[in-house]
């Protein structure tokens, strides 16, 4: 096992041991679940993810793959959860911590994506659904928003947290894994770190070719590289790259060590893997 894989495995193990698992809740009647979620929101407390947790633990496997066929046949919990997102008031949302707000939006993006897929399933790729990102709208915080609106106008614009790109799942094979639990404010830091470690541990997302000093990265780092500048921008390292690319590489230095770190810091060029848009289905 190479140093990169060993380092990622150790880090991932630490994160897993330090994080709390999701405990499955007994299924309640539809009206009771909706009432519980609405009441929770009206008290200006963190939103209830009970129904969403049930969906993730039941239909998502350890590789982040979704059993869309079964979810489509048993979609009541997902529909309840997505409907409850529209009933959260702006005042309630603004009473939450930043971590709770980020968790809310990431969960919403991922759950709405699940809805978009099962509404049209069977499909081979999310890209086969016309307007899925730009025109298809969902109710959240009392208004209609698109998936692009959630990602680009809220998460990327209002928060300085580039690791959201390790959490947003657009139902494709090359996306980050969909977790088997919801994101939650008090666990968000650990969850995002675990996601990043897992994502970078895959050679299909991050690989160093020492023969020509080239770093190969997921296309996610190409599409959203500017999101790393605010926190990871550097003028001292990676001077052969533009500021955006250097920021991404500087970010990745936090997740490699030893020989791998030396190779990364000596990189001369970057290339990006083709993105596999095939459906992330079981």
List the predicted regions and their residue ranges:
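Bacterial N-terminal signal peptides that target proteins for export
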Residues: 1-9
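Residue-level signal for mature regions of secreted extracellular proteins and peptides
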Residues: 13-14
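Interaction/scaffold regions that mediate signaling and macromolecular assembly across diverse proteins
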Residues: 22-95, 99-106, 110-282
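C-terminal motif of bacterial Sec signal peptides marking the signal peptidase cleavage site
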Residues: 17-19
């Amino acid at each position: 096992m190479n140093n990169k894989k060993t380092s990622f495995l150790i880090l991932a193990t630490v994160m897993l041991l330090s994080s709390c698992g999701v405990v499955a809740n007994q299924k309640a009647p539809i009206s009771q679940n909706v009432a519980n979620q609405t009441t929770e929101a009206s008290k200006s407390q963190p939103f209830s993810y009970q129904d969403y947790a049930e969906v993730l633990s039941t239909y998502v496997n350890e590789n982040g793959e979704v059993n869309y066929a079964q979810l489509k046949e048993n979609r009541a919990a997902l529909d309840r959860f997505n409907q409850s997102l529209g009933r959260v008031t702006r005042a309630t949302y603004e009473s939450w911590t930043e971590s709770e707000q980020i968790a809310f939006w990431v969960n919403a993006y991922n759950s709405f994506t699940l809805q978009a897929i099962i509404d049209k399933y069977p499909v081979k790729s999310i890209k086969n659904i016309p307007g899925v990102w730009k025109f298809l709208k969902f109710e959240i915080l009392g208004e209609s928003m698109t998936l692009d609106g959630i990602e680009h106008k809220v998460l990327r614009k209002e928060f300085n947290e580039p690791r959201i790109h390790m959490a947003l799942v657009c139902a494709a094979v090359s996306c980050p894994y969909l977790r088997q639990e919801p994101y939650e404010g008090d666990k968000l830091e650990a969850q995002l770190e675990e996601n990043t470690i897992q994502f970078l541990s895959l050679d299909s997302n991050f690989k160093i070719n020492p023969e020509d000093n080239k770093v190969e990265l997921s296309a996610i780092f190409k599409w959203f590289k500017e999101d790393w500048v605010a926190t990871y921008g550097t003028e001292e390292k990676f001077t052969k790259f533009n500021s955006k690319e250097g920021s991404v590489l500087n970010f990745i230095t936090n997740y490699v060590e030893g020989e791998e770190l030396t190779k990364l810091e000596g990189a001369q060029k970057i290339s990006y893997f083709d993105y596999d848009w095939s459906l992330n289905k079981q």
